């Protein structure tokens, strides 16, 4: 897979292009230039470390949307076994923007649910760019209730720019579907681990994001609105997106400081798309650890902690009158 580089990665891209050019020269002319290539590879690694050691919130936002970043289905295939997808909300339709089904995690039965964005143009349209409609959230809730009935732990993979704001979605009760999921997930009598793997966009993310543990991949984001949307509202221009990203505190590091997430899953150097297998291994380790810890807790304690966590989001104090 040919790597695609973001604008701020151009110095790295130029160095990688030189390395690739040398490889072709050596192969075509049967010249051993492995030593030169090794030196350039080490230089590229150090440059990547330097660039990624001081990323801005806006740059991290770009990485979270990288076109080659692994999606929910990628992690399902790499982490879980015997995945059997389930379809439909049993009320209106099946929404491809949400995928979910039964699977095994090293032998243990689980239910997995996630947003799915799509890769090429055809699939992106089919998946509605990862923006679920009401039937997607109702499908997710149907599967969660199934998991509760059979005492299966739930893993939710979050990666969406937000819930679909179209007229048809609103007519079918988009806000009710999201609110219903929040209400029901707070009471489900089974462990829930949620992971932001890319974009965590507003209520569209939170609708499958109420759980006992909330993890974020290192270069994922979680916010009430996109930086561009925030900039358009506050400064009347999407050009201020970089400023908005910094002000909103959308990164895993900032949210960890605020106590809104439980842990950060480290990504390979350069981002999850650079080494999907390694990223999946890192996430699998964290999922197993958290599920084992939650399985040891009494259900009453689990539900009380989950409710307290949900009520702690967005707390503010009104000034005395």
UniProtKB/Swiss-Prot annotation:
Check the record and name the Gene3D superfamilies matching this protein.
2-enoyl-CoA Hydratase, Chain A, domain 1 (3.90.226.10)
Entry keywords, A to Z:
ATP-binding, Cytoplasm, Fatty acid biosynthesis, Fatty acid metabolism, Lipid biosynthesis, Lipid metabolism, Nucleotide-binding, Transferase
* GO CC annotation, single: acetyl-CoA carboxylase complex
Which top-rank group of organisms is this from? Bacteria
Which reaction is recorded as catalysed by this protein? N(6)-carboxybiotinyl-L-lysyl-[protein] + acetyl-CoA = N(6)-biotinyl-L-lysyl-[protein] + malonyl-CoA
The job of this chain, per UniProt, is described as: Component of the acetyl coenzyme A carboxylase (ACC) complex. First, biotin carboxylase catalyzes the carboxylation of biotin on its carrier protein (BCCP) and then the CO(2) group is transferred by the carboxyltransferase to acetyl-CoA to form malonyl-CoA.
The record's comment on protein family reads: Belongs to the AccA family.
Quaternary structure note? Acetyl-CoA carboxylase is a heterohexamer composed of biotin carboxyl carrier protein (AccB), biotin carboxylase (AccC) and two subunits each of ACCase subunit alpha (AccA) and ACCase subunit beta (AccD).
Protein name as it appears in the record:
Acetyl-coenzyme A carboxylase carboxyl transferase subunit alpha
UniProt organism field:
Methylococcus capsulatus (strain ATCC 33009 / NCIMB 11132 / Bath)
User: What lineage does UniProt assign to this protein's organism?
Assistant: Bacteria, Pseudomonadati, Pseudomonadota, Gammaproteobacteria, Methylococcales
